[in-house]
């Protein structure tokens, strides 16, 4: 399997619960390495630009409002099959449907406050990493 990179965001609800370390431990236990990371409080413009693909969806405004409601932890992860591996770790978007032991089953409150974001494909991951880490170094380890 190929070494890939994927973008992960620990959303405001999970940051507020102080579970960043527990989530990082799951990444590392699954063989994913953090190759870039930063904590930030997204502006409305940043959140709207990042989630622009959802602009016409009925949940867009609520998603943007939620994503700017508190700080987020953003990281680029690297490892074999990183995109799928991270999606497996996250679990289903709706935590009620997420398998036991996944990040969302353990830490998410609702389909809106669902703890984490992860890239859905290698190409999307490239774009998302460039969005948040433009001009910053991303280090393979």
Swiss-Prot record:
CDD domains: NDPk_I. GO terms for molecular function: ATP binding; metal ion binding; nucleoside diphosphate kinase activity. The active site is at residue 117. It catalyses: a 2'-deoxyribonucleoside 5'-diphosphate + ATP = a 2'-deoxyribonucleoside 5'-triphosphate + ADP; a ribonucleoside 5'-diphosphate + ATP = a ribonucleoside 5'-triphosphate + ADP. PANTHER family: NUCLEOSIDE DIPHOSPHATE KINASE, NUCLEOSIDE DIPHOSPHATE KINASE DDB_G0292928-RELATED. Belongs to the NDK family. Major role in the synthesis of nucleoside triphosphates other than ATP. The ATP gamma phosphate is transferred to the NDP beta phosphate via a ping-pong mechanism, using a phosphorylated active-site intermediate. This is Nucleoside diphosphate kinase.
